[in-house]
A protein has these predicted regions:
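Active-site rim helix/loop that mediates acceptor-substrate recognition in acyltransferases
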Residues: 1-11, 19
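Acyl-donor (CoA/ACP) binding surface of acyl/acetyltransferases
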Residues: 18-153
């Protein structure tokens, strides 16, 4: 699978998520998909953290911050969107923390584990990203403060 992800692809990019230590062991992966150069958009297709010791949210936040920066600053995209299962705790919270606007729900759009699930679409635009970046909203201390506010209210 990893070998198939290597190389040049016009419409998707995969990254390994590694430990921030001397080992640099792979703990997961992330990808941008559906990269459209005409519409200047892409999907935060997936974030998978396989090591439970790093599945506490901070690795997710760091990964999303990296994906935002890469999408808007390197690829010069105008729109970045994500799709997640309604009720998926990590995806839904991360979308709120990173100022992704809820665009809509596709009802019973996916069949998984013997039942249908709704899908939530979130997105952020280039100008919104830069406003929040300039305000320092993507600094970890501000993200943690927003997380506390979400949990308490």
């Amino acid at each position: 699978w990893v070998e198939g992800c290597k190389g040049h692809h016009d419409d998707y990019i995969f990254w390994a998520i590694c430990k921030d230590d001397e080992s640099e062991d792979i703990i997961g992966w992330a990808s941008l998909a559906n990269i459209n150069k005409v519409n200047k958009s892409a999907s935060t297709h997936s974030i998978v953290i396989g090591d439970r010791d790093y599945n506490d949210g901070f690795t997710w936040i760091e990964t999303v911050r990296f994906m935002f920066e890469y999408a808007f600053e390197t690829l010069k995209l105008n729109r970045l969107y994500g799709v997640s299962l309604v009720g998926h705790p990590m995806s839904n919270i991360i979308g709120d923390l990173m100022f992704m606007a809820k665009e809509g729900v596709l009802r019973q759009a996916i069949f998984k584990n013997g039942r249908f699930y709704d899908l939530l679409y979130n997105a952020i635009l280039r100008d919104e990203y830069y406003i929040h970046k300039e305000n320092g909203d993507y600094e970890m201390r501000k993200i943690i403060k927003r997380l506390r506010n979400l949990r308490h209210g």
